[in-house]
Amino acid sequence: MRVKIISDSTCDLSPALLERYDIAVTPLCVIKDGKDFHDGVDITPVDIFAHVDGGGDLCSTSAVSQYEYGEMFARYANEYDAVVQITIGANFSCCYQNACAAAQEYENVFVVDSENLSTGQGLLVVAAAKLAEQGLSGAEIAERVRALAPKVEASFLIERLDYMRKGGRCSAVAALGANLLHLKPCIEVRNGKMAVCKKYRGSFEKCIRQYVKERLDGREDIAPELAFITHAAADANVVAAAKEEAAQYGSFE
């Protein structure tokens, strides 16, 4: 049984992992200065940060279209016994709806709503790829991944609210106050939606250590096979602190 795993680019998996598990990617569209780019193809997060930090407007995104999903499915549906497409959470984008519409033309294409984004979605994509290596059918993989989706724990800490202010998600006054008070909001994905679960205070490295400890300390419900430490051009010392803290609570892949 040969099953092709496809994911939206929002899974944020490294090129090495994509190659290791032979995962195909459907890139979202990134709109910068009125021009369309494909996420991970001709524009990267580093490009976006450099653009905005240089005074440019905040970039926006648009979903993978039904036509683009259809092209991807046409490429693999005949070559493989089945195709499993894992999308960004349906509450974050219309990618899932577009993929479902495109999949109606195929009996062997299965679409899964990850209920997540970034490497929360990435965890499910890797899980699906491992199941494909074990020889499970497309239907079985889709069923297993749908069952895993609510069990994924994905959260992140925001160092500064500048980007949220530019995106209209908080006022300039709120952003200034949070930055002055060194407040670091923790955003958690719950039931397919994002919500603020806690606010930390202090240096980013200190907050990261406390955050990781609270996420992992005393937990007996965590699968040790794989965990992702995901960051957007964070300081190397902060990334090292997160890894060091996480290593105290298990030997993750």
Language-model-derived ranges and their functions:
Residues 4-65:
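N-terminal glycine-rich anion-binding loop in soluble enzyme alpha/beta folds
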Residues 1, 59-60, 86, 229-230:
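Short, contiguous strand/loop micro-motifs
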Residues 1, 80-82, 223-225:
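Short coil/turn segments at beta-strand junctions that form active-site/ligand-binding loops
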Residues 52-53, 77, 132, 165:
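Hydrophobic residues in alpha-helical segments
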